[in-house]
């Protein structure tokens, strides 16, 4: 944490307001210094940041949570570190309060309870689907947010509550009187499943949802021999008895496997059946009272139309077949037509019967086509062809001479390739090397990790540009997606606004509100304003690989052969353009040239793709 003129900073985030303390974090409202967007920072206390056991589990949980999005869950952008303290950057929300605060002096209608429990079940189903559980569902861990005056479920402690159970109880004992503390702990224990002995899984969450639903409906906990909701709410249209009692089963295996489906059945499809059943009983009594004691002959009850539809019984004939020996029946040579006629009715069926043998067909394994990951496509901008000027008299020697070139029209990605796009390519090829054993990417220098054979993106970095990628990796990805790398000439023309010949992609000047440079890390693509052509991140964020080999004096040759120049035929280095997140301002000029070995790996190197006009 850094102090500047009495203003509190955490990395690139300026603290605006305190929001309070949660179970595992101090929450503050902050604004990014450069992109001027507000976030909520969840700052871990020093004792948790220094705990290896907690941080190991914390990192695993954050990775999983960052991969999902739900209105009732914390939307994680990234995780950062300031000194020895970690903090989680999350999306700004409108503020929340605990369910206990919301219920204070308030009685919810049945429809409100259905709305809240449905949202809770939806969020938990998503959490359970990625192998996590909440672990501590109760009136203080479940929060509500408000939209247009309607309360909505919000779960700020998903995945962490069970890790900090002892910390929670210790905090409760240190605040308030002993009587208040014991009462609150008792209420918390009411939500815990009977089998819980450090086991906080899906089944425990289901049990807690049952307790919460009962409390919201009845206003008390289902303790001991408790009355069913139907007794407390005789006018209810919903089968709360079925849903709540199924959640509160003592055996874990007997509880619903899918909370959302169990709630849907009890509050929609089955409610009509229950209502019909309750209405059918009086009708049955009326039928019994009105039933006559003596009935007429059955024939009198047959309608005229039914007589016309009588089905005549089919008469079956009994046929006696003279038995013959098997040898006689199997004789295939016939002396006369009479013998043929007399025996074919018996011999042919018998031959067929005796010749019938079990047929075992050869097992042929059904070939199943392996489903490979499909690419995530990027929107492209068409750059119109024509004659352009490139080079600069204000830069380095390799930017001279300034000369005109001619290019055909081409397409260019609006932003660099991101981690979530590149990870699909790696999953498809199944390796970090190409067929010639060239490295495509070095994972330890990127935001992509391999754990237990699976590729995982660091939390919050899915939309950041991929880094640590070599020229071989960039070129292979472009080929896989049906595109190519842009030439150095194409890149400079696109960055400078075509025929406008701008100094920077943003215009004649540039500052930190327009690009990510001289900072501490990459930012998500498209975080800054686009260029005049609609391209993002052409300045800063990451250097971008180009197709060309680099030559110090290539512009001299290009001036003589100006039609679609594509660099020298061979070389040692490949061209990089655009500057990066830690570059100085001068490196962001459209004409600035950078280069490195095609196998070089750097946390500032990325790329974008181009495509010819067909």
Curated annotation (Swiss-Prot):
Belongs to the protein kinase superfamily. Ser/Thr protein kinase family. Together with the serine/threonine kinase PknD, may play a role in specific interactions with host proteins during host intracellular growth. Autophosphorylates and phosphorylates IncG, an inclusion-membrane protein required for the modification of the nascent chlamydial inclusion. Changing residue 42 to A: No autophosphorylation; protein can be phosphorylated by PknD. It comes from the Bacteria. It comes from Chlamydia trachomatis serovar L2 (strain ATCC VR-902B / DSM 19102 / 434/Bu). Keywords: ATP-binding, Kinase, Nucleotide-binding, Transferase. Gene3D superfamilies: paralog of FGE (formylglycine-generating enzyme), Phosphorylase Kinase, domain 1, Transferase(Phosphotransferase) domain 1. It catalyses: L-seryl-[protein] + ATP = O-phospho-L-seryl-[protein] + ADP + H(+); L-threonyl-[protein] + ATP = O-phospho-L-threonyl-[protein] + ADP + H(+). Residues 13-276 form the Protein kinase domain. The keyword Repeat does not apply. It is an enzyme of class 2 (transferase). ATP binds at residues 19-27, 42. Autophosphorylates on serine and threonine residues. Present in elementary bodies 40 hours post-infection as 2 proteins of approximately 70 and 65 kDa; the smaller one may be due to differential phosphorylation or degradation. Induction: Transcribed after 6 hours in infected mouse fibroblast cells, that is from the mid-phase of the developmental cycle. Its EC number is 2.7.11.1. GO terms for molecular function: ATP binding; formylglycine-generating oxidase activity; protein serine kinase activity; protein serine/threonine kinase activity. Interacts with PknD, interacts with and phosphorylates IncG. This is Serine/threonine-protein kinase Pkn1. The lineage of its organism: Bacteria, Pseudomonadati, Chlamydiota, Chlamydiia, Chlamydiales. Pfam families: FGE-sulfatase (PF03781), Pkinase (PF00069).
